[in-house]
């Protein structure tokens, strides 16, 4: 009953719908690349375990830089800007990564992607808190957790696509679709963009 009430509240709040939609897109099309890093490093970039490990940490390095930048801001007027623009930067960086066959470019692209996803990750709960009341906030945050739960299924789908098309094309298609969907959703999520 509490969950159903949370869905009812979310369905009538355009700002929450926008936030949840972009959360769904990020978990379907961005985070799914991580299990493919070893395959990408070996088959596309032709590097060994050490450079593959560094490549796997590039996203985290970028996220650390991005989160630090946000933390240093004395005042943030448009939290939604960090959220949806950060998601676009993250998916755009991942798309560049999918096209790269040069290690340094691949590493840089993932650092940029990590910087973008920091905006998504830091502002996601903030937007939910700003657009919900005390009585329903916990339920709405529960729905956020449910949307994050799409990630394992998405990983299976992208992994299957990589088995057929190769890791680069699978990541490219996934991130490209993610960029398009995020741009469309951000355009229509006017109430979310006010936050």
Residue ranges and their predicted role:
Residues 4, 11, 25, 37-195:
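C-terminal transmembrane bundle of multi-pass solute transporters/carriers
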Residues 1-21:
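Juxtamembrane intracellular "pre-TM" segments in multi-pass secondary transporters
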Residues 19-20, 28-40:
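Short helix-kink/termination motifs in transmembrane helices of multi-pass secondary transporters
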């Amino acid at each position: 009953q509490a969950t159903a009430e949370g869905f009812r509240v979310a369905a009538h709040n355009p700002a929450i719908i926008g936030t949840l939609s972009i959360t769904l897109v990020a978990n379907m099309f961005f985070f799914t690349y991580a299990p493919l890093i070893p395959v990408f490093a070996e088959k596309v970039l032709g590097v060994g375990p050490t450079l593959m490990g560094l490549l796997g940490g590039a996203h985290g390095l970028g996220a650390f830089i991005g989160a630090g930048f946000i933390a240093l801001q004395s005042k943030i007027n448009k939290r939604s800007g960090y959220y949806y623009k950060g998601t676009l930067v993250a998916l755009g960086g991942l798309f560049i990564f999918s096209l790269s066959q040069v290690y340094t470019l691949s590493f840089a692209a993932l650092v940029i992607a990590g910087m973008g996803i920091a905006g998504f990750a830091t502002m996601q709960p903030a937007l939910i808190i700003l657009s919900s009341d005390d009585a329903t906030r916990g339920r709405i945050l529960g729905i956020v957790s449910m949307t994050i739960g799409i990630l394992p299924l998405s990983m299976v789908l992208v992994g299957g696509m990589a088995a057929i098309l190769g890791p680069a094309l699978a990541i490219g298609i996934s991130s490209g679709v993610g960029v398009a969907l995020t741009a469309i959703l951000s355009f229509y999520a006017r109430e979310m963009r006010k936050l």
